[in-house]
Swiss-Prot record:
The gene is PA. Binds 2 manganese ions per subunit. HAMAP family: INFV_PA. It comes from Influenza A virus (strain A/Singapore/1/1957 H2N2). Its cofactor is Mn(2+). Belongs to the influenza viruses PA family. The lineage of its organism: Viruses, Riboviria, Orthornavirae, Negarnaviricota, Polyploviricotina. Phosphorylated on serines and threonines by host kinases, including human casein kinase II. It holds the Pfam family Flu_PA. It is found in: Host cytoplasm; Host nucleus. Its EC number is 3.1.-.-. GO terms for molecular function: endonuclease activity; metal ion binding; RNA binding. This is Polymerase acidic protein.
Length: 716
């Protein structure tokens, strides 16, 4: 039956049913008929609600899924399928906003047109018997009852069927189909009887004669009689069964299930080698901004105009020179490229009208930096089919790198607060459904905690840079276009601010496929001296380009200003994902919501307000060598956001592989902590799969280090 349910119903419905059974302490492996009944009831509730909307005139209308009008208000609020706490929160909110009488039991739906709660019943018995049982239980004339059966019958309060005939016919057809599918698999009789709690034939009668002989003949191979088979099933040990099955599959497979104990797991081995280097597409904690407040200049909002205005705010330019060369690059070319940018920006300022975009002259230094004419010539395969020694290039294995402290510092910095506001509260219309009040409250609290966060700045910076680069790649394919790296924010006082981080020069960009690469040179301002952590800046040539006066406790101090220059590349698909970094905010909000839900279900009321306003309470943030780190709810929000943002900034195959494989080990460890006595086979193979993803990526190496801290403290 369980297999049938998983095949027959939408995975979302199955998941909700699993959650409901778990909430009431029922085992779906044992109560399989109940599992099927819950899924059926959920599906009927969803079908009841589907396609029914209320238009601006307050009339009920039916709208198909692909109709643009689907943004209308839903006619029905679905209460069934939510966890108890959230369901009661929705019911209370509906009662408060509509004046409806609060029901004693949780109903399934609320009808905004008829202004009444609805109890949906799905029965395998006579509809009128089930209707009377429901009515006696509810004892309220205010809640409307609507019963469906698997035979196509229905019954509703005062014969008011709420929906049109076609909508009800869809539900009846679906129930009839489920019944037929169950019957074809021999599941229907057991399912039908289970609603009445009838005893099965085996319990009532001793099986004798022909039926007994048929039972003995219907057993799997190697069983001589029904008693033997029953004894086998009663003493069934799944672990041994899996071993046996695996050994039948292949002579090579010899899996012995080993118990997983506290002493079983070992730490993940991190690679040795030179320290890992920075590989993000733009500088993070080391970035420096040239900013203008309350921009009101001519052409404000046009990137090139904004960039020139920001450049004019700095007066400490000096003759640039290389302070940290790139080991494999032609460093004078990077120096000449920066001088060319300065010269061409000066030329623009001397013109009467500043152009909207700037294409750089194709000088030898830029051609070199952008890899112009460096790609090997492509030859049609048919022209070289007959070459006997045709072979692919031998590619070198990537060099193993060790974890370096800078990536933990980057992450810590991403969790910190800045002096600026990087996102506004969404201008979302008035809440329509009661559940939206809670959602809005949570969103507003969360936004207040993360709007000043440096990780949020990285989101807005990443979105801007990737959007500008993709636009330029499509609009000026052959040009070396100069793209300012800009972001917008507000000061704490609410004044608008435009920031310039540096410039990008893009190369030729005839991007036919999603993975075709466009080369670019990035030039970014910074106050970080690269000589302090030279291994971090392996891929960069760093110039000293000026001196900046900074206010400090002892007055004004002069600090050298650096320019971090490197050749880089990206593709259409990477730029697309870079443009879509905003969902990182949503992902971390959902993680916080699940924490609130857990707390609310324990306290049996919505805990959103207490969660965010109780500043004295601390929450677990993560593992470190010292143990479980804790912090305020704001710190938790910002840490979750930073993790999501870094997953986007440092996305790579190594990260995908590590996340997927380490999750398996994590689940086994969690099962051990929950006293579920997990067993494993080929644990060495799992460690191998995890460790082959640890090559040179700083973010993956840091996650592996965190995982080891978790293992240490989880298994004490």
């Amino acid at each position: 039956m369980e297999d049938f349910v998983r095949q027959c119903f939408n995975p979302m419905i199955v998941e909700l049913a699993e959650r409901a059974m778990k909430e009431y302490g029922e085992d779906l492996k044992i109560e399989t008929n109940k599992f099927a009944a819950i899924c059926t009831h959920l599906e009927v509730c969803f079908m009841y609600s589907d396609f029914h909307f209320i238009n601006e005139q307050g009339e009920s209308i039916i709208v198909e899924l692909d109709d643009p009008n689907a943004l209308l208000k839903h006619r029905f609020e679905i209460i069934e399928g939510r966890d108890r706490t959230m369901a009661w929160t929705v019911v209370n909110s509906i009662c408060n906003t509509t004046g409806a009488e609060k029901p004693k039991f949780l109903p399934d739906l609320y009808d905004y047109k008829e202004n009444r709660f609805i109890e949906i019943g799905v029965t395998r018995r006579e509809v009128h018997i089930y209707y009377l049982e429901k009515a006696n239980k509810i004892k309220s004339e205010k809640t409307h009852i609507h019963i469906f059966s698997f035979t196509g019958e229905e019954m509703a309060t005062k014969a008011d069927y709420t929906l049109d005939e076609e909508s009800r016919a869809r539900i009846k057809t679906r129930l009839f189909t489920i019944r037929q599918e169950m019957a074809s698999r021999g599941l229907w009789d057991s399912f039908r009887q289970s609603e009445r709690g009838e005893e099965t034939i085996e319990e009532r009668f001793e099986i004798t004669g022909t039926m007994r002989r048929l039972a003995d003949q219907s057993l799997p191979p190697n069983f001589s009689c029904l008693e033997n088979f029953r004894a086998y099933v009663d003493g069934f040990e799944p672990n041994g069964y899996i071993e046996g099955k695996l050994s039948q599959m292949s002579k090579e497979v010899n899996a012995k299930i080993e118990p997983f104990l506290k002493t079983t797991p070992r730490p993940i081995r991190l690679p040795d080698g030179p320290p890992c280097s920075q590989r993000s597409k733009f500088l993070l904690m080391d970035a420096l901004k040239l900013s203008i407040e309350d921009p009101s200049h001519e052409g404000e909002g046009i990137p090139l105009y904004d960039a020139i205005k920001c450049m004019r705010t700095f007066f400490g330019w000096k003759e640039p020179y290389v302070v940290k060369p790139h080991e494999k690059g032609i460093n004078p070319n990077y120096l000449l490229s920066w001088k060319q940018v300065l010269a061409e920006l000066q030329d623009i300022e001397n013109e009467e009208k500043i152009p909207r975009t700037k294409n750089m002259k194709k000088t030898s230094q830029l051609k070199w930096a952008l890899g112009e004419n460096m790609a090997p010539e492509k030859v049609d395969f048919d022209d070289c089919r007959n070459i006997s020694d045709l072979k692919q290039y031998d590619s070198d294995e990537p060099e193993l790198r060790s974890l370096s402290s800078w990536i933990q510092n980057e992450f810590n910095k991403a969790c910190e607060l800045t002096n600026s506001i990087w996102i506004e509260l969404d201008e979302i219309g008035e809440d329509v459904a009661p559940i939206e009040h809670i959602a809005s409250m949570r969103r507003n609290y969360f936004t207040a905690e993360v709007s000043h966060c440096r990780a949020t700045e990285y989101i807005m910076k990443g979105v801007y840079i990737n959007t500008a680069l993709l636009n330029a790649s499509c609009a000026a394919m052959d040009d070396f276009q100069l793209i300012p790296m800009i972001s917008k924010c507000r000061t704490k006082e609410g004044r608008r601010k435009t920031n310039l981080y540096g410039f990008i020069i893009k190369g030729r960009s005839h991007l036919r496929n999603d993975t075709d690469v466009v080369n670019f040179v990035s030039m970014e301002f910074s106050l970080t001296d690269p000589r302090l952590e030279p291994h971090k800046w392996e891929k960069y040539c760093v110039l000293e380009i000026g001196d900046m006066l900074l206010r400090s406790a002892i007055g004004q101090v002069s600090r050298p200003m650096f320019l971090y220059v490197r050749t880089n590349g990206t593709s259409k698909i990477k730029m697309k994902w870079g443009m879509e970094m905003r969902p990182c905010l949503l992902q971390s909000l959902q993680q916080i919501e699940s924490m609130i839900e857990a707390e609310s279900s324990v306290k049996e009321k919505d805990m959103t307000k207490e969660f965010f306003e109780n500043k004295s309470e601390t929450w677990p943030i993560g593992e470190s060598p010292k143990g479980v780190e804790e912090g305020s709810i704001g710190k938790v929000c910002r840490t979750l956001l930073a993790k999501s943002v870094f997953n986007s900034l440092y996305a790579s195959p190594q990260l995908e592989g590590f996340s997927a494989e380490s999750r398996k080990l994590l689940l086994v460890v969690q099962a051990l902590r929950d006293n579920l006595e997990p067993g494993t086979f080929d644990l060495g193979g799992l460690y191998e799969a995890i460790e082959e993803c640890l090559i040179n990526d700083p973010w993956v190496l840091l996650n592996a280090s965190w995982f080891n801290s978790f293992l240490t403290h989880a298994l004490r």
